[in-house]
């Protein structure tokens, strides 16, 4: 009986992978050949959620100062009969030192692109989302929260100028090329020229306030924040 169930799950996994479009298939270009605008990131995230057969949910947690959507993908492989709400409630009790169910899953948070001009982060997030949803690991329970772009306004400011100036697929390594000069407005910051990576404690910016409200509703055991290195 176990072998039959394992075989059915394998068939389901292969079928799911075959049906879901990769970032390249959805966007029309290979990841890394150009930068993706934030609305395209949201569109692909929503697409993945609809194709995940209940594995993933795209949850909107706010909007930026320029009106761009802020959201996180919640990818959850849960025991039969267990809901996301139960996992959240169980973990909140654990934080307070109350008795909890030790069998419920680990909660992991991955965030990308807090500095908008470190734009490779969101491209990596798209590939990460695709890998986790198209070929899910069903052997262990887990909840993975993925924020593909913490700073949508800064990202689009950078991506717009980069895509206008970049004439070579994959970029020009010459440091004197105009693609390496952002101009007056740096995509590192948000709409109000504030570095969101310096706002975790003070929470002066709209984007931070909304994100941390979502974060506190989960209080993940692990948080990895992805940056570039020059």
Feature annotation, model-predicted:
Residues 19-33, 110:
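Acidic/histidine-rich, surface-exposed loop or edge segments in extracytoplasmic proteins
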Residues 13-17:
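N-terminal signal peptide c-region/cleavage motif recognized by signal peptidases
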Residues 35, 81-84, 118-119, 156:
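Short, solvent-exposed loop/turn elements at domain surfaces
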């Amino acid at each position: 009986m176990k072998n039959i169930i394992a075989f059915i799950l394998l068939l389901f996994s292969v079928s799911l992978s075959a049906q879901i479009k990769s970032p390249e298939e959805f966007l029309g270009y290979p990841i890394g050949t150009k930068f993706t605008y934030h609305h395209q990131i949201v569109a692909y995230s929503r697409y993945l959620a609809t194709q995940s057969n209940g594995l993933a949910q795209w949850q909107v947690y706010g909007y930026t100062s320029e009106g761009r959507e802020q959201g996180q993908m919640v990818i959850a492989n849960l025991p039969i009969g267990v809901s996301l709400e139960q996992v959240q409630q169980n973990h909140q009790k654990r934080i307070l030192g109350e008795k909890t169910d030790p069998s419920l899953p680990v909660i992991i948070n991955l965030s990308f692109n807090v500095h908008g001009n470190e734009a490779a982060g969101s491209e990596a997030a798209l590939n990460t989302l695709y890998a986790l949803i198209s070929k899910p690991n069903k052997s262990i329970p887990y909840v993975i929260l993925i924020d593909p772009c913490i700073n949508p306004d800064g990202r689009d400011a950078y991506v717009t100028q980069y895509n206008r100036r970049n004439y070579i697929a994959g970029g020009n390594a010459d440091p004197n090329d105009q693609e390496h000069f952002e101009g007056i407005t740096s995509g590192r910051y948000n709409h109000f020229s504030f570095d969101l990576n310096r706002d975790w404690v003070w929470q002066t910016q709209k984007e931070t306030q909304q994100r941390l409200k979502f974060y506190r509703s989960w209080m993940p055991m692990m948080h990895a924040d992805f940056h570039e290195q020059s």
